[in-house]
């Protein structure tokens, strides 16, 4: 491995080597080598999802020893989601870096942007990331949130303001840590004295009810945030309470949730961060409100033309109303390097003035979680998914042209019935046959689902 390559660029929950070779090697000159050991395969390819790593498939060449490889020169910097294809079947490579995206485990890797290191792991004091569980009164599920506390929190008695930070569609509460490096960004900002010390709470934004078929805003996350998450945080962490010490931000879907929730609850939040605002038109409600936020921040990538145009219109509306907002555009598409830079520029603006502390959150709403639900969630708990969301996103718009995506259910990869039977499912419409290896020895041949194509 390149000794000059920072550890933050290779931080994944899972990464292994196969046949003594890493699946992805990023060279000092910017080239990227892809490798997959697949001795029975005829064709192996990789492709991105769009943006700087397009969905055009790259062919890997056989190495004569059961492996396939390809070296791509001058690969563009950034954190990239991507897929592997073996004989036309899309797979997630278990030997490559894995994150949670597109409602599933997905492969990721990163190419460093030159002279950009604000999200690197450095020899500075580091905060703590805690994984906390709470009960959602909306879904009656046990859920997790990731909570960043600044260095020194455990030893002191100081109380801190809180930023509630939301992920994008298809991602979950893990996104801002593993893909976004939010904890490392906060460590750097605090160590350099560029921001106030604060707690950052990252939650799963899906508040689905069982059987619900929601559109763009998934379920009722507003209720879950105000009646479950915030009360939990204010009960279990040393926080400064009240509007002046509470902010909300998010990317993509999370930006839409932040805009909607802050617009409805201007007395509870003093700042809003809207990164790649897919519902940027909703910012008009914040502008038209009699309440005024201390910080209104909008951002997007240079190639997000519709969002950028919407930001310009909202910025003009704020100016006409005699109100202030900040608008930033960064080079890039709808991708994580844009959102990291957004967080880096947004956080230093927060909690800069002293305010009054108030106990303004309504009482916590409790929900009964069944024993069966707890048992099921216990058995399904994984490194990236505690309360798995088995959905896909179908992008649609309503009559006014606004986002109104739907979230159809997808079958679980494996499901254990009450009778103890294991049902295995794998979506592979291009495959001729699919087998599952049980205990690495016995192979189970899967039959085609007659009700669901693919």
List each language-model region with its residue ranges.
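Non-catalytic cap/lid and distal C-terminal segments of serine-dependent acyl enzymes
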Residues: 2-57, 61-395, 400-404, 417-433, ...
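Short Pro/Gly-enriched beta-strand edge/turn motifs at strand-loop
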Residues: 406-408
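Surface-exposed, proline-enriched loop/turn segments that connect beta strands in immunoglobulin-like
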Residues: 21, 410-412
């Amino acid at each position: 491995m390149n000794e000059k390559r920072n550890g933050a660029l290779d931080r994944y929950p899972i990464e292994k080597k196969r046949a003594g070779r890493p699946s992805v090697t990023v060279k000092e000159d910017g080239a990227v080598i892809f490798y997959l050991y697949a001795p029975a395969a005829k064709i192996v390819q990789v492709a991105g999802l769009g943006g700087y790593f397009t969905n055009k498939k790259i062919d890997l060449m056989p190495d004569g020893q059961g492996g396939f490889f390809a070296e791509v020169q001058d690969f563009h910097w950034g954190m990239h989601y991507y897929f592997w294809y073996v004989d036309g079947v899309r797979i997630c490579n278990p030997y490559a870096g894995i994150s949670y995206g597109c409602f599933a485990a997905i492969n990721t890797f990163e190419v460093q942007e030159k002279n950009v290191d604000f999200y690197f792991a450095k020899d500075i004091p580091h905060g703590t990331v805690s994984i906390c569980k709470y009960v959602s009164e909306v879904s009656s599920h046990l859920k997790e949130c990731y909570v960043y506390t600044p260095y020194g929190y455990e030893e002191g008695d100081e109380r801190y303001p809180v930023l509630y930070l939301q992920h994008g569609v298809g991602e979950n509460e893990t996104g801002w840590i593993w893909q976004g490096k939010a904890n490392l960004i906060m460590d750097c900002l605090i160590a350099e004295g560029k921001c106030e010390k604060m707690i950052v709470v990252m939650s799963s934004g899906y508040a689905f009810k069982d059987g619900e078929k929601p559109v763009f805003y998934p379920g009722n996350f507003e209720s879950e945030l105000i009646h479950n998450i915030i009360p939990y945080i204010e009960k279990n962490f040393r926080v400064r309470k009240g509007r002046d010490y509470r902010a909300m931000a998010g990317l993509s879907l999370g930006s839409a949730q932040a805009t909607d929730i802050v617009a409805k609850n201007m007395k509870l939040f003093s700042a809003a961060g809207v990164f790649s605002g897919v519902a940027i038109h909703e910012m008009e409600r914040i502008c038209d409100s009699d309440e005024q936020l201390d910080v209104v921040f909008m951002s997007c990538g240079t190639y997000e033309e519709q969002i950028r145009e919407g930001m310009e219109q909202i910025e003009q509306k704020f100016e006409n109303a005699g109100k202030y907002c900040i608008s930033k555009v960064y080079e890039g598409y709808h991708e994580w390097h844009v959102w990291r830079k957004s967080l880096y520029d947004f956080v230093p603006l927060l909690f800069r003035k002293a305010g009054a502390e108030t106990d303004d959150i309504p009482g916590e709403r409790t929900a009964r979680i069944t024993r069966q639900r707890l048992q099921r969630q216990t058995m399904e708990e994984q490194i990236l998914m505690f309360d798995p969301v088995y959905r896909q996103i179908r992008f649609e718009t309503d009559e006014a042209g606004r986002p109104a995506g739907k979230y159809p259910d997808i079958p679980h990869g494996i499901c254990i019935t009450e009778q103890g039977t294991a049902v295995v499912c794998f979506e592979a419409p291009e495959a001729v046959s699919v087998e599952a290896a049980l205990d690495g020895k016995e192979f189970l041949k899967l039959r085609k689902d007659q009700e669901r194509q693919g």
